[in-house]
């Protein structure tokens, strides 16, 4: 399988960057147009590159530019013709976006561009624009609703809410190299029926839309919210997600995850193989409509409900992995034969979840909600 990330090339790039000061000619800052967001559309032989310079300051002009070329590099060179400044500067790119059609055609050229570039950085988060082109998103977000600000806000929100992880170019390339599959944070404009009071004159803001899944270099599908959170729980991205649980008397109790730890182990029975997934989550009660969460029986009931919800999310992630035939859960680590053709599609997963609920100001001894299911 083609390697998506070459250590030797990365080391060479680092060597170049360590001496970049001697390679750059002195230039006035006011002559530079700093690019903060870059977008990619099209495919091999016909690439469109869109860029945004970020929020404008009092003495600077925010610019959104786009150009086509036979490759990313030629499109980038053509961008210079449209720049109001003397030179475009790409060393401060904060975000990258790929249109859905471009992602379905393959992202190897994009990963290669970031890997080899002397100005580009591998630590840049890479988003997939679901159902749209990157050009549409960047061009529609200008002025006060500039795309860089929108993506910065989205990144901060996902970290705070635990709703997604913004995978970087390096993380995506590394996972493709070792697992043949990877995820990227998916974004989408709000649907027409969804009002965004903060938006002005129909501005298109970027909303988190689960995960895009890559098998090899190509986009093969998307994960919905439940499957996305289930994958995060398994892969150690400790979320701070909230769950609204029924209290059994018509009310609800809201809890927020504190920690989530997962362990995977192989299960072999004759010629059949499965993966056992054991998850332990700790959560805190943040809101109640009236239930006595100090009551041991109520606490045990809520733990059972939380276990049921977490189990369903992990099952959704495992089912998506089978359906897409993409091992983005990295099950091969405990069951190497998963890398064999057709093995993943028929792999069974056994999910066991243990939940512990606590209150920040008074931790109670609790019965642990457990639920085990077999799915496959």
Residue ranges: model-predicted function:
Residues 2-9, 17-376:
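Membrane-proximal alpha-helical signals and transmembrane carboxylates
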């Amino acid at each position: 399988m083609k390697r998506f990330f070459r250590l030797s090339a990365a080391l060479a790039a680092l060597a170049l960057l360590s001496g970049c000061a001697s390679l750059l000619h002195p230039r006035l800052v006011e002559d530079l147009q700093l690019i903060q967001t870059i977008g990619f559309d099209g495919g091999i032989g016909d690439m469109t590159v869109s860029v945004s310079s970020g929020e404008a300051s009092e003495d600077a002009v925010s610019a959104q530019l786009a150009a086509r070329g036979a490759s990313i590099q030629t499109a980038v060179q053509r961008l210079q013709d449209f720049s109001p400044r003397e030179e475009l500067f790409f060393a401060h790119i904060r975000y990258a976006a790929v249109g859905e059609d471009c992602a379905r055609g393959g992202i190897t050229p994009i990963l290669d561009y970031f890997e080899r570039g002397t100005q580009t950085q591998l630590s840049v988060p890479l988003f997939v624009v679901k159902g749209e082109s990157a050009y549409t998103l960047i061009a529609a977000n200008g002025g006060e609703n500039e795309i860089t600000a929108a993506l910065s806000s989205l990144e901060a929100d996902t970290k705070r809410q635990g709703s997604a992880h913004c995978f970087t170019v390096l993380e995506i390339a590394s996972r493709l190299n070792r697992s043949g599959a990877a995820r990227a944070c998916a974004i989408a404009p709000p649907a027409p029926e969804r009002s965004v009071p903060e938006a002005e004159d129909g501005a298109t803001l970027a909303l988190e839309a689960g995960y895009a899944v890559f098998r090899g270099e190509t986009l093969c599908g998307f994960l919905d919210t439940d499957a996305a959170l289930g994958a995060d729980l398994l892969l150690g991205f400790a979320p701070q997600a909230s769950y609204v649980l029924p209290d059994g008397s018509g009310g609800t109790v809201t809890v927020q995850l504190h920690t989530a730890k997962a362990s995977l182990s192989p299960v072999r029975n004759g010629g059949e193989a499965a993966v056992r997934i054991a998850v332990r989550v700790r959560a805190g009660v943040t809101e109640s409509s009236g239930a006595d969460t100090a009551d041991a029986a109520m606490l045990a009931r809520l733990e059972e409900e939380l276990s049921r919800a977490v189990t369903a999310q992990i099952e959704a992630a495992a089912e998506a992995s089978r359906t897409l035939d993409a091992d983005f859960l990295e099950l091969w680590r405990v069951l190497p034969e998963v890398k064999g053709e057709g093995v993943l599609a028929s792999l069974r997963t056994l999910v066991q979840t243990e939940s512990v609920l606590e209150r920040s100001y008074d931790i109670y001894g609790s019965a642990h909600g457990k639920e085990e299911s077999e799915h496959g």
